Each structure stands twice: as C-alpha cells, then as structure tokens.
C-alpha cells in the first residue's frame, strides 16, 4: 500500500491538460488546488493534497507563473511551488509606445506588477535618472520587442531588463 502511494505521488503523471497556473502573494493553497482541478484536470486529487502537505506548500508556496504539463507527478508540482520553479513569461512590447498609460497597461496585463507602479516609475525623475532617462525621454528606453522574464519581476527588474536590451541594441556603431 505504501509503495502504491509513493508511486502514485512521485512517479505517476497526475494531470490531463497543459495548464498555466498563476500564483499571487495572496493566493491560498485551496485556490491553487481548485485551479489545478479546474484547469489542469487532476486525475488523483488526494495525491496532490498528500504532496502539498508533505512539502508544506501552504507555508512555503512562492508566487509565480507555473506551466503544468500532463506528464508531471504531484510531487513535482508541489516542489515547483515551494522552490519557485517558474516558467518565464514573454513580455511583448509592440505597437505604439508613445503613451505612458498604454505602456503601463501593456506591462501590467502581462506581468504581476500593477499598472499604477509602472506608471509611477515612468513619471519618476529620480527612478529614471538611474537608467539615464527622464520622464520626457523614457519612451526611447522601451524598444519594441519580446522580453523573456519571470512573471513576478518587479518594476525595477523590468526596467533593468529594458535598459540592458537598450544598451545591447545601441552600440557605438549604431549610435553614430
């Protein structure tokens, strides 16, 4: 009996669907289990519950964007949540980038950050000075592209990445 449970929890695939699970800081384990059952098609709910208890998911769960595949056993999903094994998100910045409200909305609909904090950063001379920009010329920092980053990235992480790509693009040869 014990080996059967071990096998069921640790080796046997427990999902029927590919599913992207979003965990916010305020998300509860009950919400995660409910979300997995609805979206990922859990085959053995008790297996998920046992693994979540064993790994203390309720106390240790990390926010993030987790891609669940049908081949995953319950224990792997529990470990993903406890250790924060996120799958990167594609942040797509394209189209018209000349309106701060639109930029803030575009970022916040794809990432965990809210549009108010992005808008605040776009208008903060002190914050932007660290990147060599001002609220007036910040549009130049944002190159239309697809940026792979973690869904939980902070506003600072996002701007660090935008600046890194900006610096990589604007080489002295291109700048001339």
Q: How should these model regions be labeled?
A:
Residues 1-176:
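Conserved catalytic or metal-liganding residues and their short signature motifs at active sites
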